[in-house]
Amino acid sequence: MRSATTERGGSGRPPSPPRSAPRRSRGAPRSAWPALGVTLIWAFLALFLVYPLLRIFYDAFSDDAGRLTLQNFVEFAGDAFYVRSLVNSLVLGLATVATTSILGFAIALLLVRYDFVARNFFSYLTLIPIISPPLVGVLGFTFILGRAGTVNVLLQDWFDVAKPLNFVYGMHGVLLVETLHLFPMITLNVVDALGKIDPALEEAAESVGARGWHKLRTITLPLTTPGYLAGALLVFIWTFSDFATPLVLGVHDLLAAQAYLNIVQFVDRRLFRMGLVISALMVLLAIAFLIAARRYVAIKDYS
């Protein structure tokens, strides 16, 4: 009896086996990888960001028995030294924003509006302070302007100065170091904002007689406000939370320095808890300034 294949085609070949469905690659389906990546990111943030913050706030708002209380903050407000540290931190942050704004705006305008020799090289030089570790900068200042620094040694040798002059030790030194370290944050944001300004707006202002300082004040500066505020907020928060620079320069009455000193002493439980209270207060203030800056930008019209 002939096969069906032989009858139809006469080839005598056996029928080809049916094609099997393509095999799936081993492991998770391709559509599951984005979900897995998002899960890992959230797990990382929860473990290393959310949990530490929650633990700080829990310890700051609780007593030794674990009961929620505001007594720790009452003690903070009743201590004149901590209140002075809070005021000093706010004043230093605002002063640093002011000085970095002047220097950062000037350099940004120079880089964007003027063409000069080695402009690109100069723009790279302005990035060095921000990419170098903060401790390197403050140590460099002490080597140059400290009591035994280069400047004081030259003053003693050349001008017979009896006592070394205090150039950097104190709040003025912290302001100087923070300004020269953080002004690139203003410069970078303002340069980006200046590059996005429509030249037609400034040309229209010039056509009606607005030139020089008047054009800068009424057209250019308002249009750079969103970018400037982003840089100013970074400068303020960085200065507000920096403890290494003040400690090296002998300034202890700042919130960040007190938080560090109280937490690392590991002896007095009350001081340790006060360090956590200061840390929680700094986080709350930083969030408040961030919300205020975002709302200020939101209610302004920059179109």
Give the residues covered by each predicted segment.
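Membrane-water interface segments at the C-terminal ends of transmembrane alpha-helices
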Residues: 30-64, 74, 78-195, 223-243, ...
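Glycine/proline-centered hinge or cleavage motifs at structural transition points of membrane proteins
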Residues: 208-210, 222
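Transmembrane helix boundary and interhelical loop/hinge segments in multi-pass membrane proteins
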Residues: 66-69, 191-203, 212, 225, ...
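Glycine-rich helix-loop "coupling/hinge" segments at transmembrane-helix boundaries
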Residues: 62, 143, 243-269
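Peri-membrane helix termini and adjoining interfacial loops of integral membrane proteins
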Residues: 12-18, 61-71, 147-160, 250-258, ...
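Transmembrane alpha-helical segments of polytopic membrane transport and secretion proteins
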Residues: 1-41, 293-303
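Short coil/turn motifs that cap or connect alpha-helices
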Residues: 117, 210-211
